[in-house]
């Protein structure tokens, strides 16, 4: 296989976890434009950064001349995928799923081009076909092609079946067949030859390939991207403060940007290959220089810039950079009111105040100090700043301390901050 073909380039970036019939798939996509799909169940009002790799993979295929199809699981989200889940999901209402579908559709739309000719992206909802099939038809036309023995032994559900305190309901157990039917319908109606997803979706993807082959004798393909786990064993995208969402109302662009700035050093160059479109040769050059002073920090910044702009756009990237300079480089020149609103949203701790008299009181209220005595000592020792300016004695707040008439930034040293909101 040529090292320059598309699949080889994906391997070179570390983007493939599983792939079926690799040689044939590689030949197929080198010789013609194919249709591929990835499904997203609206089980929350926003996608999170765990969804980024499949979305970016769809974008890579589209850039290479193929047609990406986004399948929103309006039907399957009412059931819930049990794959590698420790306990049964709580059922979502039709009302919530419909609202979440609208929000997630808007999020996904910014990743792909829906107006570029033959390989324009397509967005579908599997509720379209599931509302048209009855249970008897489904069992006869789909269920008969699956062995319960095989389904029970799939790794994705086996851990639940072997746990007497949990088990798995027939409802969740049937999810595998529903997703397989999605692949079958998309192959029949949209000529989809490839399904992609996270590594935890391998069992569901395999079932779809199995169903299509049994019913039509056609050969289709599956490909999964790596499931990223942090060194602490927690899934990538989870932090001490919760999930990192793609919706700017749930995770601000500043906090999103800072997430990437704070990844482990060992992952920087791997993530540049996974999440950006920078050439691998250029990333390798950066990695060779990683021991140069500040090089890794600069390369984290490069990663954060690329992904924040991809997800949130140029303007919100610039806002995240302004806030970063404001907090860490004491640059207040270009800070905007909306930037401080982002900080209040989830960037740093804040308190609402109206009649705080002096700095010592404010430091105690914000928990930057445990007592007025400690606050006094910190001020004397030159540890406290107001709006990035060092304060050397107790301070009575004035209107000039209120940025945009609303905000005052208190800092203890370089890393502890709190926002007074007047």
From Swiss-Prot:
S4 RNA-binding domain span: 357-414
GO molecular function, one term: ATP binding
Residue positions binding ATP: 238
Motif ('KMSKS' region): 235-239
UniProt cross-references to Gene3D superfamilies, sorted A to Z: HUPs, RNA-binding S4 domain, Tyrosyl-Transfer RNA Synthetase
EC id: 6.1.1.1
Major subcellular location class: cytoplasm
PROSITE patterns assigned: S4 (PS50889)
Catalytic reactions of this protein: tRNA(Tyr) + L-tyrosine + ATP = L-tyrosyl-tRNA(Tyr) + AMP + diphosphate + H(+)
CDD domains referenced in this protein's UniProt entry, alphabetically: TyrRS_core (cd00805)
Primary enzyme class: ligase
Binding site for L-tyrosine: 37, 175, 179
GO CC term, one of those recorded: cytosol
Entry keywords, A to Z: Aminoacyl-tRNA synthetase, ATP-binding, Cytoplasm, Ligase, Nucleotide-binding, Protein biosynthesis, RNA-binding
One family name in Pfam for this protein: SYY_C-terminal
InterPro entries: aa-tRNA-synth_Ic, Rossmann-like_a/b/a_fold, S4_RNA-bd_sf, SYY-like_C, Tyr-tRNA-ligase, Tyr-tRNA-ligase_bac-type, Tyr-tRNA-ligase_bac_1
One Gene Ontology biological process: tyrosyl-tRNA aminoacylation
Description of how the protein assembles with itself and partners: Homodimer.
Record-linked HAMAP family: Tyr_tRNA_synth_type1
Protein family per UniProt: Belongs to the class-I aminoacyl-tRNA synthetase family. TyrS type 1 subfamily.
Name of the molecule in the record: Tyrosine--tRNA ligase
Species in which this protein is naturally found: Buchnera aphidicola subsp. Acyrthosiphon pisum (strain 5A)
Underlying gene: tyrS
């Amino acid at each position: 296989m040529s090292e320059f073909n598309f699949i080889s380039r994906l391997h070179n970036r570390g983007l493939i976890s599983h792939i079926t019939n690799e040689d044939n798939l590689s030949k197929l996509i080198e010789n013609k434009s194919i249709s591929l799909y990835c499904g997203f169940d609206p089980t929350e009002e926003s996608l999170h950064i765990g969804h980024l790799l499949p979305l970016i993979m769809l974008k890579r295929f589209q850039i290479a001349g193929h047609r990406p199809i986004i399948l929103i699981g309006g039907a399957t989200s009412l059931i819930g995928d049990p794959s590698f889940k420790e306990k049964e999901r709580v059922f979502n209402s039709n009302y919530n799923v419909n609202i979440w579908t609208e929000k997630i559709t808007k999020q996904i739309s910014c990743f792909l081009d829906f107006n570029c000719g033959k390989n324009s992206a397509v967005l579908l909802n599997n509720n379209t076909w599931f509302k048209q099939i009855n249970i008897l038809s489904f069992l006869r036309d789909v269920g008969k092609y699956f062995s319960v023995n095989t389904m029970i032994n799939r790794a994705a559900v086996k851990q639940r079946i072997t746990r007497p305190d949990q088990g798995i309901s027939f409802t969740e157990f049937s999810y595998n067949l529903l997703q397989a039917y999605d692949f079958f319908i998309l192959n029949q109606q949209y000529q989809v030859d490839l399904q992609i997803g996270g590594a935890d979706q391998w069992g569901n993807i395999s079932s779809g390939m199995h169903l299509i082959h049994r019913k039509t004798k056609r050969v289709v393909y599956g490909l999964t991207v790596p499931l990223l786990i942090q060194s602490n064993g927690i899934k990538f995208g989870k932090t001490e403060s919760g999930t990192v969402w793609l919706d700017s109302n749930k995770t601000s662009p500043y906090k999103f940007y800072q997430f990437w700035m704070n990844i482990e050093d060992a992952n920087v160059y791997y993530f540049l290959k996974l999440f950006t479109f920078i050439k691998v040769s250029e990333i390798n050059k950066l990695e060779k220089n990683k021991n140069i002073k500040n090089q890794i920090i600069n390369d984290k910044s490069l990663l954060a810039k690329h992904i924040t702009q991809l997800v949130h756009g140029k303007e919100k990237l610039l806002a995240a950079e302004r806030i970063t300079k404001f907090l860490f480089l004491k640059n207040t020149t270009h800070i905007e009111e909306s930037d401080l609103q982002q900080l209040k949203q989830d960037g740093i701790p804040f308190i609402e105040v109206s009649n705080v008299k002096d700095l010592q009181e404010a430091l105690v209220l914000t928990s930057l100090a445990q007592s007025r005595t400690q606050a006094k000592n910190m001020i004397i020792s030159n540890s406290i700043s107001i709006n990035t300016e060092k304060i050397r004695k107790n301070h009575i707040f004035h209107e000039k301390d209120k940025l945009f008439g609303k905000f005052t930034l208190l800092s203890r040293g370089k890393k502890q901050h709190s926002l007074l909101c007047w």
